[in-house]
Amino acid sequence: PFTYGFTTDGDLVEPDNAEMLALAKNFGTQTLLHLSTLTEQGNFSAQRAEAMLNDPQIQSRLIEQTVRVMQEKGFSGVDVDFEYLGRDLAESYAAFLTELAQAVHKAGGILMAAVAPKTSDDQPGTLYEGHDYAAIGRAADQVLLMTYEWGYTYGPPMAVAPVNAVRRVVEYAVGRIAPEKLLLGFPNYAYDWTLPYEAGLTRAVVIVNETTP
């Protein structure tokens, strides 16, 4: 309900968030425009990211529309969450964040970027390879470490955010990004598994703390 997506032509896809923004304003809460590669089906699309990142005109259109909506709706800045980009898009993604940050700053906002929970520069996997911690840290004002989802719906029973795993991510991150820029992601949910767990069959039920403000 809160994510802004975009088309392959670089046009911003806006959610129906008027009620949520009004509520935030009533409570004096600052808001960020959340920009992601999520599709209408709820999946992250590397194809949409690639089309935008490799075309300067499409990229400029998306940046212009994002900043305009940020100003029109009173957002304090932009929060970017592009996932599963792969190694080939890492450099162009960081360059996009740099361009977006310049436009956002000119309009008086801040830029935040979410990054996958890496523990090394060369960590394999499309989720990790598209995020260059050092380059993203230089571009963004704040960087959110997505330190959660080790335990997930179709995986084996385990903590969503194991302390030892989170610690390894933080130790790596502070060596690549200025510590004062870092934010630690903390899950407001858990999973309930049916036991015994059967790989490929067991599906955990998500438990959400809906009373948390």
Outline where the language-model segments fall:
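Glycan-recognition patch characteristic of GH18 chitinases/ENGases
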Residues: 1-65
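Aromatic-lined carbohydrate-binding surfaces of glycoside hydrolases
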Residues: 7, 35-53, 78-89, 115-120, ...
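Substrate-binding surface in catalytic domains of secreted glycosidases
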Residues: 8-18, 90-212
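Surface-exposed charge patches
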Residues: 22, 68, 102
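Append "and occasionally in soluble cytosolic enzymes with long acidic Gly/Pro-rich linkers
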Residues: 32, 67-71, 210-213
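Short, acidic/polar
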Residues: 55-72, 125-134
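Active-site groove signature of glycoside hydrolases
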Residues: 61-92, 142-156
